[in-house]
């Protein structure tokens, strides 16, 4: 069953109560995949992206518990991005040292703040959509093939023709499946978006 009771504000407050373990698990489950996706989009390998996400989330918890995050001075997304950007830059620096040792160029450019915000927003939308799709699979009688068609189109960016061929469907049926699944996901996505809203008061 979908849990939409924990806003980011409530989770942050929960980090201070009863050791904050339950709140931390939800916060980590919510933001770790976004940080991993961000790191992947910036060219890190799957393992490096997972390491960056791990290091980022550990740092977030430590800084928050040390009182170093002040919500009145900035959005949580900006704080998370700042930590993630530093961790990603560390990986690039290590790579640059190895490149220089081999006599190769060590120049690396990390996107500016607006580009990072845009990537973050895209990754957050994908995480929310995946969570909503998992909820739909668990709680509805939507055909598995329709859900698979939606996944292939949206997450794997396959063409309608490819999806139709892979799933033994007509192209028209693929379009209809995508439309049906998207319609069913709309309300769940809206609920989840409110939970992921870092800027809520």
Q: What residue spans do the PLM features occupy?
A:
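DNA-recognition helix of helix-turn-helix
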Residues: 89, 160-191
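Conserved RNAP core-binding helix
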Residues: 5-12, 28, 36, 46-66, ...
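Structural recognition of an alpha-helix C-terminal capping motif at a helix-to-coil junction
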Residues: 51-58, 74-86
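A short, charge-rich alpha-helical start-of-domain segment used by transcription regulators
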Residues: 17-37
């Amino acid at each position: 069953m979908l849990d939409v009771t924990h806003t980011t504000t409530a989770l942050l407050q929960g980090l201070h109560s009863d050791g904050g373990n339950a709140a931390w698990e939800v916060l980590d489950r919510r933001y770790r995949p976004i940080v991993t996706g961000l790191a992947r989009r910036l060219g890190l390998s799957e393992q490096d992206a997972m390491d960056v996400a791990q290091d980022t989330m550990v740092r977030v918890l430590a800084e928050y518990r040390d009182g170093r995050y002040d919500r009145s001075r900035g959005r949580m997304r900006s704080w998370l991005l700042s930590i993630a950007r530093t961790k990603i830059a560390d990986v690039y620096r290590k790579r640059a040292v190895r490149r220089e040792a081999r006599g190769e160029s060590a120049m690396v450019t990390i996107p500016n703040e607006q580009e990072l915000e845009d990537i973050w927003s895209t990754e957050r939308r994908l995480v929310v959509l995946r969570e909503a799709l998992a909820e739909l699979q668990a709680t509805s009688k939507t055909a598995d093939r329709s859900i698979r068609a939606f996944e292939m189109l949206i997450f794997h960016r396959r063409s309608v023709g490819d999806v139709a061929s892979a799933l033994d469907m007509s192209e028209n049926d693929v379009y209809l499946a995508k439309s049906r699944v998207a319609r069913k996901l709309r309300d769940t996505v809206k609920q989840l978006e409110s939970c992921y809203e870092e800027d809520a008061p």
